[in-house]
Structure formats: C-alpha cells, structure tokens
C-alpha cells in the first residue's frame, strides 16, 4: 500500500444548479481495496468528477515519487484511466503499468518531471465520447456507417463535449491544485485504440492547449472490419485541421496482429498525408511493432517510446 503524505490537495466543484467550477470543492479519496493501486509514486482519486458536458466519472492523478508540490510538472492526460496502473483491478487482468515504467525513467533523467491524469471511460459512452464528431459529420450514408452508428455510437456523438470537459473543467482543476506547467509545451494527450483517435482529435481541436499527442494502435477503421468510409473522413479532417508543421508533435504506432493487423492500410494513408503536409521526424513519428497486438500488455511493453517522444528533458 502506498503511503499518502505530502500529496497535492485536488478539488472538483459541485456543478449542481450550473455552479461554476471552483465554487465548491471535495478532496479525493485514497483508492480502496478494489480500486487501482500503484507501486511507485502516489495516486489520488476523484470518485466522480462532475461535469456540465459529460457524465461524471472517476479521475485519478498519478504523482511521481519526486513530486513535492513545489517544482512545476508537465501534465499527460491519458484516456481509459481505469486501465493505466493496476492489472489486479482491470476487466482483463492487464494494465499499462504507467507508474512502474515512468518513475524509473524520471529518476534516471530520461524524462522531464510530469504527472499523469487518468480519465476513466464510461463504457456505455466510450465510442460516442472518443469518435471524433467531425469524422461522424462527414460520413456518407452507407451500410458500413449505418452499422457503426447503430452498433457502436448508439447515441449522439459526444467527443466535442468530452474535449470541453478536459479543457474547460478538468485541466483548470488540476492546474489550480497541483504544481503544473500550464502551457501547451507541457500539456499532452495519450491514448490507445479509440483513445488514439480522440488524442489526435484533441491535438487538432485545441492546438493552443495541447502541444503534442501520442496515439497507440489508433483505431482508424472505427469497427472490426476494414472500410474506406471512416479512414477517408479522418484523412479529410486531418488535411483541414492538423496544425502546421513545426506547431505540433505527434507520435503514432501500431502492432501487426489482432485488431492492429487491420490498421496497416489506414495508417499508411495517414503517414503519407503527414509527409505531403510537411510533417517529418523527429516532430512526427509513426512506428510499427511486429508481433504486437491490441491490448494493454502490448502498449505497456512499448510505453517508454511515446513517453520519451513527449517528455524528453529540455536541452
């Protein structure tokens, strides 16, 4: 069990009656026995972070062992927060084990000081919150898209609302209560699968807030079969909205088995678009990991690489 001392005091406001964030606050609780625990650093938890835009959900903030509340830290916002730290608490017995990978890298000087904000998904809303609304608005009416809307989205597309929750409610609360660097050069997004899609979308929609993103195993196809419609909508959007070269950084990758085996064509199209638009290494990277699949164990095994990309110490 991690001892909680000298933790930053986090707060979220009661939003009942339209009350603005900051009007009232509640301290987070320590994780219970059935919730995520960490082996390195400290974890603080809002059991239900309130929002005017999306349903309330748990949010956890990981503080590295060196965090003392005085030195400003970069902030990495990660999606699917319930899968980030503790395999004993997840539905599939796997986790990213972010604390175990990041803490020794920070201690060794391989990464700048940073904290992680793990945003839990709401399973019933995950596709609706992570599928970019701009993609959805551009989809043609076809059997593929009709099936996707009926079977996956199931409701109105909530990704714009989800990003507003992060930018307008969650980030101000974290910045107010933790020692953070608040500029875009220290504020990043990371996710896998659908979380990769929303991370890239967030980078494009809020370039003044997020300076870089990492998208692992990006689920460009939307469903479980290759299709042309959803990748085409993504490409058209990226052509319009991706920040100009030199004004953003983006890490992408994929494996070659399981669902990741279906991403080769779409990811190749995205890679070609990046080159066409003038985005080149080292500011934009796309990597392939042979033999790796679509699961937390795979993402954990290569997590050090996107962490270095996002958080390499400043010269």
Task: Give each language-model segment a name.
Residues 6-27:
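N-terminal export signals
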């Amino acid at each position: 069990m991690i001892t909680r001392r000298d933790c930053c005091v986090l707060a979220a406001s009661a939003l009942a009656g339209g009350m603005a964030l900051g009007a009232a606050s509640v301290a987070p609780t320590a994780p219970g026995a059935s919730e995520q625990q960490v082996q390195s650093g400290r974890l603080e938890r809002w059991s239900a972070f309130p929002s005017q835009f999306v349903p309330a959900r748990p949010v956890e903030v990981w503080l590295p062992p060196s965090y003392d509340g005085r030195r400003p830290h970069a902030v990495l916002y990660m999606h699917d927060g319930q899968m980030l730290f503790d395999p004993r608490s997840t539905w599939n017995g796997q986790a990213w084990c972010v604390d175990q990978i990041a803490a020794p890298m920070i201690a060794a000087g391989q990464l700048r000081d940073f904290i992680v904000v793990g945003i839990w998904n709401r399973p019933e809303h995950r596709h609706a919150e992570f599928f970019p609304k701009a993609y959805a608005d551009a989809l043609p009416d076809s059997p593929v898209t009709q099936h996707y809307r009926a079977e996956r989205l199931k409701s109105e597309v909530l990704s714009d609302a989800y990003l507003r929750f992060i930018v307008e409610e969650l980030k101000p609360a974290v910045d107010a209560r933790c020692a953070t660097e608040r500029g875009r050069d220290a504020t990043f997004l990371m996710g896998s699968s659908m979380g990769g899609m929303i991370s890239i979308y967030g980078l494009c929609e809020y370039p003044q807030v997020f300076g870089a993103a990492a998208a692992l195993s990006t689920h460009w196809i939307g469903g479980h079969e290759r299709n042309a419609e959803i990748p085409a909508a993504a490409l058209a959007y990226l052509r319009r909205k991706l920040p100009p070269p030199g004004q953003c950084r983006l890490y992408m990758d994929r494996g070659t088995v399981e669902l990741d085996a279906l991403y080769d064509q779409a990811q190749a199209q995205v890679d070609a678009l990046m080159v066409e638009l003038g985005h080149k290494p080292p500011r934009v990277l796309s990597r392939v990991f042979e033999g790796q699949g679509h699961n937390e164990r795979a993402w954990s095994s290569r997590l050090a690489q996107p962490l270095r990309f996002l958080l390499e110490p400043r010269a």
